[in-house]
Amino acid sequence: FDSLDIIDEWDFINNDGNTANETVDEDNYGQHNHGTMVFSTLAGYDPGNLIGPAFDSEFLLAKTEDVPNESQVEEDNYVAALEWGEQNGADVASSSLGYLDWYSYCDMDGNTGVTTIAVDIATYLGVLCITSAGNWGTSEPPPDPCDTLYYYISAPADADSVISVGAVNSEGDIAYFSSHGPTYDGRIKPEVCARGVSTWCVNANSDSYRTASGTSLSAPLVSGAAAVILSAHPDWTPMQVREAMMMTSDRVDTPDNDYGYGVIDVMAAIDYETSAIDENSIPDEFSILNIYPNPFNPTTTMQFKVGTDGHTSLHVYDITGHLVETIINEKLMAGDHYYKWDASGLSSGIYFIHINLPTGNITQKITYLK
């Protein structure tokens, strides 16, 4: 760790700038153990023993988990840490945690969990969020979907924009403990997998190394890989990195709710050409100038310009691709146009605005927060 570039740190439990153990309880419960193992997997640098994929990055360290207790304030700490990270220029947020004690499977819809919503907002603001899928894979699915949450992924792994990470062994086989998908609304989870069985890491209690297992160890490997991809493509958005990693993983042709899209392939992801819109390819005849505010509650205004007279359609879709509302479906005259959309009566979450003219189309993501 001596060579790592830690530019700032903050303890959101004790509200100070020290992320090491500070209290007797933290010592007794081994507050430092989990974070040390995870951070070493991500960033450790000891040639011949351990080299994490992101060892040459800059780091912000945030302590949000009160290990002796499991309470909802930890979600608030996580949200505060995401906001702090975004304000301080974070490109990737790696977390090895999950919240399930006060949620049911019915809540894993991408729109309910406090941290789930925060991840979608952070992604919109330019922070790629990666989190562990969870270690409840040996449990049985709850008889009633609205019973206590086990077996499935937990918040914030259910977020629409997150990269949730399952665990495989050295042979690429799914770990028996790795939590499963799908989300309650039917999306495949996890997104990808990495090694999380007998993963090499630092021993937090001695000057040595050890192995550890869990999706807590697979998530930082994917986070480090994402940092490498971003170093090759600094202009990519979080969703472009997410797409590249998923579309180049080894099960992309047969994704399922154990492996997701499979084990990542970093070099293939770097070479991947994302399907995101190239601004230079957008026709001159029209453009979306602004959608504001975004995130919004409950109304937002869409401003766009039509270069020539012609038929225009503007639709709103939810995250599953279902049509929510058609706002425009008529001939428009050339010029600037403004439309206010009211989402009252809809659930909080991610929606997509799609505008179409004979000359082309464009899609933009919006976030509705109640």
Name each region found by the language model.
Residues F39-L42, L60-D66, D91, G98, ...:
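Hydrolase catalytic cores
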Residues F1-W10, N14-E74, N88-D91, Y124-G126, ...:
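Subtilisin-like serine protease catalytic core
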Residues E83-D107, S132-A133:
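Short acidic, glycine-rich surface-loop motifs adjacent to enzyme active sites
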Residues I282-Y292, F296-K370:
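C-terminal outer-membrane/trafficking sorting elements
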